């Protein structure tokens, strides 16, 4: 079982998910997709963004957040990425098993999910206060590589 899990709740844009899959392969993470999906897993744009790596990604698809949440305790400590997070993602010391949760491109994670997990909601600081958010696949890469950087520093 992977030590790092990347979860995308209701992704809308196939090429972001394809890029996220490539990032997961690069960092040794398992990709989880929580329905509804805004595309088919057979989408040509998804495959194009994932290049010839996509067949190796093997994302786990969950019918709902509730279904995924049942499996969550077995996967590791979860951190919810949102522009509304009060704490920077770099201020977290990620444990040996971690789950990074991201929302859909247009609106992010549902407010009720962020409220329920406010103590584990983190943000990626941005210098431009008028910028609402980063691209989803960019955010996933930033978060995933920070976890791997910390783990490497600790010899994990």
What are the language-model segments listed below?
Residues 1-156:
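Post-transcriptional modification and biogenesis factors for structured RNAs
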